[in-house]
Amino acid sequence: MEELPATAIGIKTKDGVVLAAERRLSYGDFVLSKSARKVFKLGRFGIAGAGIVGDIQTLTRIMNVEIKYYEMYNSRKISARAAAKLLSVILYQNKVLPYISELLFGGVDEDGPKLFILDPIGSLIEDSYAAVGSGARVAIGVLEAEYNESLTSEAAKELAIKSMKSAVERDVMSGDGIDILIINKNNIYEDFIKI
């Protein structure tokens, strides 16, 4: 499969999850926008992705509704694993005409921080760090060299920025700033880094 345009990064920390994605929206060698968001809050969770931005936005809207429905119907909060599995099922149900996106899903629940990687047809993998999209090959090298399980959220944010800057230097389909989501047990913080 061809690499999907954009770069998104996820890092699990000792107390949370950091998701980051750059803002360039490109198709082929044409830059359509320099301000396309690819990182979104989903209640207590977050999602970041590479691929068709409209598909990522649509999946975010669907998941917002599905999470609220689950919690209302079951009278309890959905776990990060159950929410990620729900997203996996939605992707798999559309495998004939898939959402063209590689996704990172993260959050903190009673079992601690969780980070999941999903492909366009719903494969679900839990990991400690990940990079998806056209800049992933460069970004993952930085993550592999510098990741450790004792990272704080602030240190993981700095690692995500460093990793993304490396990817942006080498990948023409990525660039124009970094959106960051820091998810802890009690809060979700958003940040934007201009590059």
From Swiss-Prot:
- Any one GO biological process: proteasomal protein catabolic process
Pfam families assigned to the protein according to its UniProt record, in alphabetical order: Proteasome (PF00227)
Entry's EC annotation: 3.4.25.1
Residue numbers covered by the propeptide annotation in the UniProt entry: 1-6
Record's catalysed reaction(s): Cleavage of peptide bonds with very broad specificity
The record's GO molecular-function terms, alphabetically, read:
threonine-type endopeptidase activity
Say where the protein is mainly found. Answer: cytoplasm
UniProt subcellular location: Cytoplasm
Q: Where is the active site?
A: 7
This entry carries the following GO cellular component terms, namely: cytoplasm; proteasome core complex, beta-subunit complex
Superkingdom is Archaea
Report the SS bond pairs.
none
**Family per UniProt?**
Belongs to the peptidase T1B family.
Its function, per the record, reads: Component of the proteasome core, a large protease complex with broad specificity involved in protein degradation.
**Name used for this protein in its record:** Proteasome subunit beta 1
- Organism source for this protein? Sulfolobus acidocaldarius (strain ATCC 33909 / DSM 639 / JCM 8929 / NBRC 15157 / NCIMB 11770)
